[in-house]
Amino acid sequence: MHQVISATTNPAKIQAILQAFEEIFGEGSCHITPVAVESGVPEQPFGSEETRAGARNRVDNAQRLHPQADFWVAIEAGINDDATFSWVVIDNGVQRGEARSATLPLPAVILDRVRQGEALGPVMSHYTGIDEIGRKEGAIGVFTAGKLTRSSVYYQAVILALSPFHNAVYR
């Protein structure tokens, strides 16, 4: 059984990680241990590079806390231009897989507050009345009318980031 350290305690992110690992390696093939670690970037990262750095830092910090795991996984959400997205970083101590999620354009009223220094989650909670929306369906669920959720979009990115770990062409 794969021991997977999730560098987050966010249920939406953990669900995506578990589903993706089970899709690739088989149901019941992994045990997820969530840990809270620092990203080393602002609470609301801006730009692709800052967001990817946050995910990489989380993986590195999780490896230091739990060096005996098989995989370390981080998902860092950020804002780039007028949209939200995330970076997924997966490491197994030998190689690293990274993938960027789909991008969701955000309304100007939301972006204005985020650009003034507020994090997306609390701004979305204010407009929707959904407490801790970032730990649930997220802005993605709201603006796609539930057709996609934060977890479902992250799932795809985790699948992509796992590609180097089960395809011999990458080795």
From Swiss-Prot:
Homodimer. Binds 1 divalent metal cation per subunit; can use either Mg(2+) or Mn(2+). Its cofactor is Mg(2+); Mn(2+). The keyword Cytoplasm does not apply. It catalyses: XTP + H2O = XDP + phosphate + H(+); ITP + H2O = IDP + phosphate + H(+). GO terms for biological process: nucleotide metabolic process; thiamine metabolic process. This is Inosine/xanthosine triphosphatase. It comes from the Bacteria. Belongs to the YjjX NTPase family. GO terms for molecular function: ITPase activity; metal ion binding; nucleotide binding; ribonucleoside triphosphate phosphatase activity. Substrate binds at T8, T9, N10, P11, A12, K13. Signal peptide: none annotated. It holds the Pfam family NTPase_I-T. Mg(2+) binds at E38, Q68. The keyword Magnesium applies. Its EC number is 3.6.1.73. Keywords: Hydrolase, Magnesium, Manganese, Metal-binding, Nucleotide metabolism, Nucleotide-binding. Phosphatase that hydrolyzes non-canonical purine nucleotides such as XTP and ITP to their respective diphosphate derivatives. Probably excludes non-canonical purines from DNA/RNA precursor pool, thus preventing their incorporation into DNA/RNA and avoiding chromosomal lesions.
